[in-house]
A protein has these predicted regions:
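Structured soluble/peripheral alpha/beta segments that form catalytic or ligand/cofactor-binding pockets
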Residues: 1-344
Length: 344
């Protein structure tokens, strides 16, 4: 599909959503201004407009020595934040989760290019920042816990091509996703009086900014890697279950160049997610095996809200191919896969 120049706002003055794949990030995701309808075509009542709109943002870091992930989500029914870090050499996993009824926290930025998202409760302060600069865009993460402080950021050069896409979701909804991977991460992590410079880890970063009127019952698989190999910076973002109507978010980056990918199949054992996964695209541009090392889980089953979420971290091996058939070997790069079910 031909890319479109992004509008200033995702929802136009008539309440209609701009769909398609955009050449850059849409500056403002004004989702609540959408003319949301019932499946029968009538204007949706205010309660549905409020509780059917979902937002989540994620910042991940990947390296041989350290992996970490942080997410902020506003499901309207519940606000959620999680943060974890994992050391492959020792197998040590440190996890933190927080919840806020009726999503009183977090407060999420409506822009993937300028703004701050924040989750704050007693003993925790998390901020995700978005800052347009003369030389590109900076995305940052700051985490303040009693025993840990993190400051991290990744810079998108002005010529970087993010995956910026908005697709239909059911008869009356849509999903906007802004994805980035394969960029170096800088900053520092301080714990127990010891400071680790992220610059020294040769770490790669991933970021996800998603919002929309998503399906009431949603399932997806997702895979991401980010790192430096064979003289190239690589990033991968592929999924199934969301953003597949008319076009997809599937792609990988090599040295800041976005290479589009066809539909992707996730082949794995649903009874044992810690067994190897096979991830292949229909156009053969992605052919990877994922070996799990550990995982972060969130499970909640309430009357109106349910979540069964597995984010698994491990190593990818295989090959990525561009449109001209040039291969980049992937040999043990760290990354993530997900299995997610949500009733929200």
């Amino acid at each position: 599909m031909q890319q479109r120049t992004p509008p200033d706002k995702l929802i136009d003055p008539d309440g209609q959503v701009h769909r398609g794949r955009f050449t850059a990030s849409v500056p403002r995701i004004n989702g609540p201004e959408y003319d949301y309808r019932t499946p029968m075509g009538r204007p949706a009542p205010a309660r549905q407009r409020r509780f059917h709109y979902k937002q989540f943002q994620y910042f991940g870091l990947v390296s041989d020595e350290l992996l970490l992930g942080c997410a902020l989500a506003d499901t309207a029914w519940l606000g959620v934040a999680f943060f974890y870090w994992f050391e492959p050499a020792t197998g040590a996993l440190h996890e933190y989760s927080w919840r806020s009824p009726l999503a009183r926290q977090p407060h999420l930025s409506q822009s993937p290019v300028n703004g701050v998202s924040r989750f704050r409760q007693k003993g925790v302060d998390i901020r995700m920042g978005y800052e347009s600069r003369t030389d590109g865009l900076r995305k940052s993460l700051a985490v303040e816990l009693p025993e840990l402080q993190l400051q991290a950021y990744m810079d998108e050069p002005a010529d970087f091509d993010p995956m910026s896409i908005c697709t239909r979701t059911g008869i009356n909804g849509w999903t906007y996703a802004n994805k980035v991977a394969g960029l170096p991460v800088q900053g520092r992590l301080t714990r127990a009086g010891q400071t680790r410079q992220l610059d020294d880890l040769n770490a790669g970063g991933h970021h996800d900014f998603s919002a929309g009127y998503m399906r009431r019952r949603t399932f997806w698989n997702w895979a991401c890697l980010s790192g430096h190999t064979d003289g190239h910076w690589l990033g991968l973002n592929v999924s199934c279950g969301v953003n597949e109507t008319s076009f997809t978010e599937n792609c990988f980056w090599r040295d800041n160049e976005l290479i589009k990918v066809d539909l992707v199949d996730f082949d794995y054992d649903g009874d044992d997610l810690m067994r190897p996964w096979r991830i292949r695209s229909g156009d053969a541009r992605v052919d990877l095996v994922f070996e799990p090392l550990n995982r972060h889980r969130e499970k909640l089953n309430l009357v109106l809200f349910a979540s069964n979420f597995h984010q698994i971290f491990g190593r990818f091996t295989g090959v990525l191919r561009d449109a001209r058939g040039r291969e980049t070997r992937v040999d043990g790069l760290h990354g993530f896969v997900e299995e997610q079910y949500a009733q929200w």
